[in-house]
A protein has these predicted regions:
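C-terminal accessory/binding modules appended to enzymatic or scaffolding proteins
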Residues: 322-344, 348-349
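Long, hydrophobic alpha/beta structural blocks
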Residues: 29-324
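Charged, amphipathic alpha-helical stretches
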Residues: 2-46
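Short, ordered beta-strand-loop transition motifs
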Residues: 113-115, 322, 349-357
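A generic structural signal for beta-strand entry/edge sites
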Residues: 327, 353-357, 397
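Conserved small/polar residues in nucleotide/adenosyl-binding loops
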Residues: 389-396
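Extended Gly/Ser/Thr-rich low-complexity repeat segments
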Residues: 366-382
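Extended, charge-rich low-complexity regions and/or helical-solenoid scaffolds
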Residues: 356-364, 369-370
Length: 400
């Protein structure tokens, strides 16, 4: 699925567009015990409650593709004959009326997902009469292309509110509000089957994870019977480790600045192009980039090999998972420097009197703990000048 296809399905989760007639739910306590189950017809809910329910479900299709939303492919063997795929198909084809399939699914989730508190499992089914889309991108609502029948699973933490004072308008008094339980934003979930090329793709599901650092291996193994993908935060850390280890003494500030700048540039260009397909790079792409930065060929090849070992041969990585476009940091055990990436090239490293320094150009507006300071040349008192702030790794911490 690409971003346009995800957005198209997200728009379904509104009261005036959805064909969701009911939502199945299972409330689980901190002991992994089922407290209650329900089958809630949306038509019987007040409009505001119906919209809130759809809003919770819709958030399972939010976030960044490749970071929070990840394709989960099924093998041909799984589609032909496997318990996990058969169960998902039973949920979809029965429109959540197969009681045995719903029970088995709830039990599978409970056995594989063990958060600290209580949580809610929601299942919804929708049938989407996909409108025809012309080559110029215009959608013809009265011309159906196919029927997309799918299920959406959402797992939400349920948190207890704290006792607070509330104002009673009719009585014009303040009272303690009772402790209540509130459904939080989805923690994980999935869409099955995927909406690929604007039609059902039973060879794939779209998995959602709110946290870029969590993987929920047991849940993924139980529901999809496959190895969990490396979380986005772990990808970033692994990428940095590979870069430093493979390049070794060739991993200079200039090289890292250039890699960061080029990856950010690729992200910006992709965003400007409005290409719905996700932006990806491979270890081979990075090898070419490193060579262009002046990295010796053998070290660039070592990097490519390490990428294949850690991420998989010819793995397609999202640049958004490898760099932070709005932050550039330099750290030592005692120093942390944060710079707007637009000005990262202002920073340089240099040896002065045999000691390594990090140099930052310091013009007007320099502050220390909120106090504006003057930087003067040693031989010129009170002279206004543009100088350099020298940071020895064990002496100073500066933020830009």
């Amino acid at each position: 699925m690409n971003e346009k296809e995800i957005s198209e399905i997200r728009r379904r989760f509104r009261a005036d567009k959805s064909n969701i007639t009911h939502v199945r739910g299972c409330y689980v306590n901190e002991k992994q015990e089922i407290v209650s189950q329900f089958d809630q017809p949306l038509s019987l809910l007040p409009q505001e409650e119906c919209e809130n329910m759809l809003s919770v479900l819709r958030r399972t299709l939010s976030g960044t593709l490749g970071k929070n939303l990840i394709e989960m492919p099924f093998t041909t063997a799984q589609v032909v004959d496997s318990d996990e795929h058969r169960l998902l198909m039973a949920l979809r084809d029965s429109k959540l009326t197969d009681e045995e399939a719903v029970r088995m699914f709830f039990e599978k989730v409970i056995a594989s997902y063990r958060p600290e508190g209580t949580y809610l499992i929601l299942l919804a089914n929708d049938t989407y009469d996909v409108p025809y889309r012309a080559k110029d991108g215009e959608t013809l609502e009265d011309a159906s292309e196919n029927i997309y029948n799918y299920v959406l699973c959402t797992v939400c933490p349920v948190k207890q509110t704290k006792p607070v004072l509330g104002y009673d308008v009719p009585e014009n008094t303040f009272h303690n509000r009772d402790i209540d339980w509130l459904v939080s934003a989805p923690q994980l979930g999935f869409l099955f089957p995927s909406f690929t090329d604007r039609s059902a793709d039973i060879y794939s599901a779209m998995y959602y994870c709110r946290s870029a650092s969590e993987s929920y291996d047991e849940f993924i193994d139980a529901v999809f019977n496959r190895e969990a993908p490396m979380p986005a935060e772990e990808q970033k850390t692994t990428f940095g480790t590979i870069l430093g280890d493979a390049l070794n003494d060739a991993c200079s500030l200039d090289v890292v600045q250039t890699v960061h700048s080029r990856l950010c540039g690729m992200i910006e260009e992709h965003k400007a192009s409005k290409d719905p397909e996700p932006l990806t790079i491979t270890g081979r792409t990075m090898k070419t980039m490193l060579t262009a930065c002046g990295v010796p060929g053998e070290k660039a090849e070592k990097f490519e090999k390490a990428c294949a070992e850690q991420f998989g041969a010819d793995a397609a990585l999202s640049p958004r998972n490898l760099v932070e476009t709005k932050k550039f940091e330099i750290e030592t055990p005692e120093v942390q420097i944060r710079v707007d990436p637009e000005y990262s090239e202002w920073i340089e490293t240099r040896y002065i009197d045999g000691a390594p320094y990090i140099l930052i150009p310091a013009g007007a507006g320099v502050q220390v703990n909120g106090v504006p300071i003057a930087i003067t040349r040693p031989d010129v008192e009170y002279e206004e000048t543009v100088s350099y702030t020298h940071l020895r790794a064990h002496e100073t911490c500066a933020d830009l």
